[in-house]
């Protein structure tokens, strides 16, 4: 029997998390990232070139020292690959008063990272210029200069460096390293076929190079790798691929019924991949790309450090029409519903039981309610909503003279853009700190706890609400890293499903993962890892 491929499918409402890669579920989005470094006034550039080899990288400084061109090749590693891939891109200055003075380049795991420095060459220019960041008119001093069919000046030979080791040399002033430089005869070949990026990235803002979000008032220190503009229903072809496949993956059905897959996961080290098969025979590949140098970082969801995609936050509100359910525990004014429940201490190693602040639709650690309402002030405005939603500007107060008050303002989606639901994809729920659960009245408020056992083993409790018991997987990679993965399906009116990925422990190489004891129950997985 042939092995079928499960093609990636976008979420029906939000689309793919990152339009640059259908398999990316969290972290910085986009093929590139630009960041202004406050402490050095340099520019950090991240370029995703999956499959690229360090020795193939070419750095070219244009003679005027205004532009840097980066090219490299990803060879055909497997006979089943459709072809090799060649990459090319450029970045440079937008002012006339400065020039690029230094380039540092670091290549690893399919990612090229640059640090570009500049120096002023026209001292008569006022202090404020387009290449200086100020707190008033903030303009990033570098910009991408992709132009289809552009030609380099021919009156001077550019200089390039091949195959250098950035650990040995930071490439100080490229034009002065003449012993390692040589000329390219046909420079135009480097630019030939470059893709014009404007149609691809114009959605991110008004500037024609708007994927450099730092050029817009919204962000003055670099691009925004979490920009919602990089989320959508369509996967973009890689704009820097000059030759070969521009897709983030390719598949091939083999003659023996097998399946070949090539998947780009730039930034993931060779030892950072895990393949697991769940109880339904679904093969899942996981890869974690650590933050390197100045890469953007942070938790996808501040409610859970292990959540990788899906609705964020501890609660989600969605106002549906013509749906209801009888309620029995109402606050006397019939304006509020109080929900309580106990999470029992299921293991002797748990710190304590937990009391979470009507058991209606309760499954896998998630309580879902459907609330119905009826109007008691017939003369009130027609527009009204559940607690937390604001009314349009200018609407009159309710019949008793009390104005509408937003008592649940922490539901950011209700103010003022969404009057029908919270926004579980709100960037406000992404950040560097994991928040304690606000509804826990007794017991631990964090989504995990650990305990070192007296026999040298490790006990862990990890919250993955919404994940059924049969949807948990545990794998041990070649470096002995224990990873837990859980997939929470869409239920009732949930915005979408959720995926959790947790690297929880290090065991010796060759450790038998079958020794790990798993107890999944009510959206919580408890595992005991015996010592070797």
Curated annotation (Swiss-Prot):
PROSITE patterns assigned to the protein according to its UniProt record, in alphabetical order: SHSP
Domain sHSP: 25-134, 439-532
Family per record: Belongs to the small heat shock protein (HSP20) family.
Protein's recorded name: Putative 57 kDa heat shock protein
Species for this entry: Arabidopsis thaliana (Mouse-ear cress)
